[in-house]
């Protein structure tokens, strides 16, 4: 009896006719997309990458350049990961034109810079990992992403000041926002290397 009473409460009393909703076979549905070139959506073709290293790389690349290897921003930063020319020189790349035309070189450069930053910030990673600073849980991947944005020195200042020294790039993106957005990824397999080169 109770089941019958409850199930009758979910049945429509009157069915409505929605003929306006149906599409005639002769009608054409048009959709407008931002771009017709599939190459504009390279980063979106990846499968689910989760919190693995590939997810870290692709998420950071998408934030930096929408994942485009040929991107040069208004400040002259280059490639998928938006490297400055000086930073490229520190990891052994002298020819920026070759760098821009070689996706494999850009990927190797990203890993080399991670190794170098991990070595530079190895003490901070040990000391601050797991702590909450300026409302952000500090993780190794967050520290490395923030170092990619503003350099190891800016990350060190932020951490040592307990978040009081707010560092931002020229576009206004903060170190702490990168720490938050890119925290919790698997970067522990990247070895720290003071002399990392491509």
Feature annotation, model-predicted:
Residues 1-2:
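Sec-dependent N-terminal signal peptides
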Residues 6-68, 104-108, 118-135, 193-197:
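Export/targeting segments at the very N-terminus of extracytoplasmic proteins
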Residues 133-193:
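Catalytic and substrate-binding regions of cell-wall glycan-acting enzymes that process beta-1,4-linked
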Residues 74-94, 114, 148:
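Substrate-binding/active-site groove segments that recognize
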Residues 58, 62, 85, 145-150:
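Generic alpha-helical structural context detector
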Residues 46-54, 73-81, 99-107, 137-141, ...:
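Solvent-exposed, acidic/flexible segments
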Residues 67-72, 89-91, 157:
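Short, solvent-exposed loop/turn elements at domain surfaces
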Residues 93-141, 149-157:
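Alpha-helical segment that forms one wall of the substrate-binding/catalytic cleft
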């Amino acid at each position: 009896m109770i089941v019958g009473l409850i199930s009758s409460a979910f049945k429509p009393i009157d069915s409505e006719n929605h003929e306006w909703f149906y599409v005639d076979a002769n009608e054409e549905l048009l959709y407008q997309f931002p771009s017709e070139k599939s190459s504009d959506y390279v980063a979106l073709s990846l499968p689910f990458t989760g919190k693995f290293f590939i997810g870290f790389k692709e998420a950071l690349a998408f934030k930096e350049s929408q994942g485009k290897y040929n991107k040069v921003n208004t400040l002259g930063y280059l490639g998928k990961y938006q490297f400055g020319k000086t930073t490229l020189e520190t990891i052994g790349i002298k020819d920026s034109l070759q760098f821009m035309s070689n996706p494999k070189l850009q990927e190797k450069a990203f890993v080399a810079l991670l190794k170098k930053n991990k070595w530079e910030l190895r003490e901070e990673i040990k000391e601050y990992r797991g702590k909450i600073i300026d409302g952000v849980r500090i993780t190794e991947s967050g520290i490395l992403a923030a170092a990619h944005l503003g350099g190891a020195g800016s990350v060190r200042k932020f951490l040592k000041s307990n978040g009081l020294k707010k560092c931002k790039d020229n576009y206004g993106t903060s170190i702490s926002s990168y720490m938050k957005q890119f925290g919790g990824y698997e970067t522990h397999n990247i070895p720290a290397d003071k002399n990392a080169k491509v």
